[in-house]
């Protein structure tokens, strides 16, 4: 399947967001946290992250990440959580279009990868130029029907 890191069969639904302007570090930690969850529960967690009621526990990029009560190091990545909510809504609509039961969907695969880099240069004094690079992020999710 072009563009996806794993192949899917007919009883799976998939969705992608290409070149999202979010932090790679936040996206990797959110993807790790929601992998294997039921789709409705993952969407509820991400909505709680947006309202800053639930902290995403960080497993990677932990330098100077503060401890959260009962979870260890974590943060509230609001901007990335909004993009993941859109991604999960897209895959839910795709599953509904394929005739799958949307109440029993389980996140089988979710990944966040580096996309294209936007290169900007800011003029500085004495003819120099300062680099201002930004990485864009590619997200993908695959869901399957689970047992009820």
From Swiss-Prot:
One of its GO terms (biological process) is cytoplasmic translation. It comes from Thermoplasma volcanium (strain ATCC 51530 / DSM 4299 / JCM 9571 / NBRC 15438 / GSS1). Pfam families: Ribosomal_L22 (PF00237). Signal peptide: none annotated. HAMAP family: Ribosomal_uL22_A (MF_01331_A). Belongs to the universal ribosomal protein uL22 family. Part of the 50S ribosomal subunit. One of its GO terms (cellular component) is cytosolic large ribosomal subunit. The keyword Cytoplasm does not apply. The keyword rRNA-binding applies. SUPFAM superfamilies: Ribosomal protein L22. This is Large ribosomal subunit protein uL22. GO terms for molecular function: rRNA binding; structural constituent of ribosome. This protein binds specifically to 23S rRNA. It makes multiple contacts with different domains of the 23S rRNA in the assembled 50S subunit and ribosome. The globular domain of the protein is located near the polypeptide exit tunnel on the outside of the subunit, while an extended beta-hairpin is found that lines the wall of the exit tunnel in the center of the 70S ribosome. It comes from the Archaea. Keywords: Ribonucleoprotein, Ribosomal protein, RNA-binding, rRNA-binding.
């Amino acid at each position: 399947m072009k563009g996806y890191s794993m192949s899917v069969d007919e009883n799976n639904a998939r969705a992608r967001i290409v070149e999202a302007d979010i932090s790679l570090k936040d996206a990797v930690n959110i993807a790790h946290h929601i992998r294997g969850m039921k789709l409705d529960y993952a969407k509820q967690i991400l909505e709680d992250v947006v309202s800053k009621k639930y902290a995403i526990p960080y497993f990677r990029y932990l330098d100077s990440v503060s401890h959260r009560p009962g979870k260890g190091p974590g943060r509230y990545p609001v901007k990335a959580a909004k993009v993941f909510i859109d991604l999960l809504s897209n895959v839910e609509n795709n599953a509904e279009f394929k005739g799958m039961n949307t109440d029993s969907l389980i996140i089988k695969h979710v990944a966040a990868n580096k996309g294209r880099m936007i290169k900007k240069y800011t003029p500085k004094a004495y003819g120099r130029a300062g680099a201002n690079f930004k990485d864009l992020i590619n997200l993908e999710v695959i869901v399957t029907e689970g047992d009820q």
